[in-house]
Amino acid sequence: MDLNNRLTEDEALEQAYDIFLELAADNLDPADILLFNLQFEERGGAELFDPAEDWAEHVDFDLNPDFFAEVVIGLAEQEGEEITDIFARVLICREKDHKLCHILWKE
């Protein structure tokens, strides 16, 4: 993989959020979609992290944080706080030539 051909943090966040919006209607309860849409402006967010260790239970490849990121999308209790109501965790490959993502949806 090429370190010089990676998505920036902002690009990774934007790409993961776009994928979330495209697939949310098929993967979330209608009530959760309504809540997310009503509250996102005030309490919503997307945060970028290194991939959590539990991804190893869901994928069978090396999750090198140089090339993979986890984007957590959801709602916080108040603006500026940590996201506590998680609607999706998106694992995304940051290498521009490898369009790979995996999503764990709110149950």
Curated annotation (Swiss-Prot):
Signal peptide: none annotated. InterPro entries: dsDNA_mimic_put, Put_dsDNA_mimic_sf. SUPFAM superfamilies: Putative dsDNA mimic. Pfam families: DUF440 (PF04269). Belongs to the putative dsDNA mimic protein family. May act as a double-stranded DNA (dsDNA) mimic. Probably regulates the activity of a dsDNA-binding protein. HAMAP family: Put_dsDNA_mimic. This is Putative double-stranded DNA mimic protein ECA2319.
